[in-house]
């Protein structure tokens, strides 16, 4: 914070991409390591919010904030409960903040990819759900789409037809049905 106040930078883009997830039931993860779920909240929500608030005074018209959410934000995810909840926070925070900053000409985009072929799964565990395995995206394609959507002023960036169908499906279908479909 002191460095920012001293240097008074003209920030054009803030990318909040830190985050992690852990697959398994809440109880299984709790027995593995007590703090892992609260650490997930700290990294995925608190750190993103803190970084945004620290940088906000140095953004101006034309600046962009890109927050990495997830398609997990669209609907509850059994066996990925805390992660999905943190990403719902990121999506909601991004949309709300984007509306607040719109009149200042600052765009906030929540990036909501499905599974992406990255080191994320080395820690979280490999996807067990066949749909997640089939919809795995390449990181460079997700980033390209996110930057394109950010430049276009979109509040939400969703990569690929399967995830776009998921996004719209979660708006049309009851969440109870969608939660059961994830068990396939």
Functional labels for PLM-detected ranges:
Residues 70:
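Residue(s) in the substrate-gating loop at a strand-loop-helix junction
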Residues 1-10:
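Conserved amphipathic alpha-helix within the SDR
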Residues 58, 75, 96-106:
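Active-site-adjacent segment of SDR/Rossmann-fold oxidoreductases
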């Amino acid at each position: 914070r002191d460095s920012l106040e001293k240097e008074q930078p003209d920030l054009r883009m803030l990318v909040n991409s830190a985050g992690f997830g852990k697959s398994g039931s809440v109880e299984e993860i709790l027995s593995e390591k007590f703090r892992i779920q609260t650490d997930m909240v700290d990294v995925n929500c608190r750190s993103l919010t803190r970084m945004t608030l620290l940088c906000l005074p140095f953004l101006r018209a034309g600046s962009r904030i890109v927050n990495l959410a997830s398609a997990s934000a669209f609907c509850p995810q059994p066996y990925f409960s805390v992660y999905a909840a943190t990403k719902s926070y990121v999506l909601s925070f991004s949309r709300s903040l984007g509306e607040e900053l719109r009149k200042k000409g600052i765009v906030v985009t929540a990036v909501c990819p499905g599974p992406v072929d990255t080191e994320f799964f080395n820690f979280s565990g490999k996807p067990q759900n066949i749909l997640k395995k089939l919809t795995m995206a390449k990181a460079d394609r997700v980033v390209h789409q996110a930057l394109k959507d950010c430049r276009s002023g979109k509040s939400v960036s969703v990569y690929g037809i399967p995830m776009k169908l998921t996004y719209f499906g979660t708006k049309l279908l009851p969440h109870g049905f969608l939660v059961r479909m994830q068990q396939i």
